[in-house]
């Protein structure tokens, strides 16, 4: 008799995706981050749901409702900090997942890569709107500054900003709609993640060597389910340690002050995971130019498959490109640091240099190194 997991309509889908899935036998721990991202999403939706039970999206009570959650709700402090730091671990996994995709040439799975980029944008939008909800100083001014960037769009900019605000400034209408979208977007992200997985299983996973995996595959369970659980333990260790020992390590002290439209904080900055893009935005003196650079810094991922000039999929055997890749990583870390610094010399100059390097490495240096390596293969 055939096992029900292979015949039952629902169990069959789960079986083909997580149990009997043919998986390359040589994939490393860099392939763990997909399942870790799924776990992060589940943690965020669960903790977010409990927070939404006690939160009020009104400018007069939002700040005090967050204080009420932290002080009066049973384990409210833990739920809140798990949610806040869960976002940080989510983005750490996200950046590592994208980095692995770039290094091992996973972007050649075009549909999977395109959906993944949309997932990144949706996650960034969700995180931004979530940051506005506690209605602290940085929430209010962050929302004001970032939404105001849309006013740089010719002709329709000002109308668009007022349409998003629901008035002439960031106020009750803005907070209510941000809460609405922040609540619904994670479920859209979950649906997109399912599509992402669907496209991935059409082609199968890549592997570190960059060669075809067809001749040598093993079932996902028990081999990789056990491996994923190990990664999950590390993730939970980091998240729980962060939540219990230093929950405010990654947050801004200004956000513990109630939003005040009459008092601007000395340094307006987003959460750490947006700092690289914020640094690129600030490095261009022109407003519209800055907004375009900000958009391009993320959307450039969409054109990466067209910039792939190498005859090899992976960077595993391409030493010149490897140097450029790790230079790009260092450049992104530099941009993240610069984004948190004041707009003054020498930070401005470093930020502008790092921004130019970011686009230069991706658009010209990596494709150029690929062409050089192709030539070297012939010698």
From Swiss-Prot:
Location relative to the cell: Mitochondrion inner membrane
Keywords attached to this entry: Electron transport, Heme, Iron, Membrane, Metal-binding, Mitochondrion, Mitochondrion inner membrane, Respiratory chain, Transmembrane, Transmembrane helix, Transport, Ubiquinone
Annotated binding of a ubiquinone, by residue: 201
Annotated residues for binding of heme b b562: 83, 182
Sample GO molecular function, one term: metal ion binding
Family: Belongs to the cytochrome b family.
Cofactor detail note: Binds 2 heme b groups non-covalently.
Entry's Gene Ontology cellular component terms: mitochondrial inner membrane; respiratory chain complex III
Note: Heme 1 (or BL or b562) is low-potential and absorbs at about 562 nm, and heme 2 (or BH or b566) is high-potential and absorbs at about 566 nm.
Organism: Saguinus midas
Membrane association type: Multi-pass membrane protein
Biological process, per Gene Ontology: mitochondrial electron transport, ubiquinol to cytochrome c
Role this protein plays: Component of the ubiquinol-cytochrome c reductase complex (complex III or cytochrome b-c1 complex) that is part of the mitochondrial respiratory chain. The b-c1 complex mediates electron transfer from ubiquinol to cytochrome c. Contributes to the generation of a proton gradient across the mitochondrial membrane that is then used for ATP synthesis.
Needed co-factor(s): heme b
Listed name of the protein: Cytochrome b
Amino acids binding heme b b566: 97, 196
Xref: InterPro entries: Cyt_b/b6_C, Cyt_b/b6_C_sf, Cyt_b/b6_N, Cytb/b6-like_sf, Cytochrome_b, Cytochrome_b_C_euk/bac, Cytochrome_b_N_euk/bac, Di-haem_cyt_TM
Subunit text: The cytochrome bc1 complex contains 11 subunits: 3 respiratory subunits (MT-CYB, CYC1 and UQCRFS1), 2 core proteins (UQCRC1 and UQCRC2) and 6 low-molecular weight proteins (UQCRH/QCR6, UQCRB/QCR7, UQCRQ/QCR8, UQCR10/QCR9, UQCR11/QCR10 and a cleavage product of UQCRFS1). This cytochrome bc1 complex then forms a dimer.
Transmembrane domains' residue ranges: 33-53, 77-98, 113-133, 178-198, 226-246, 288-308, 320-340, 347-367
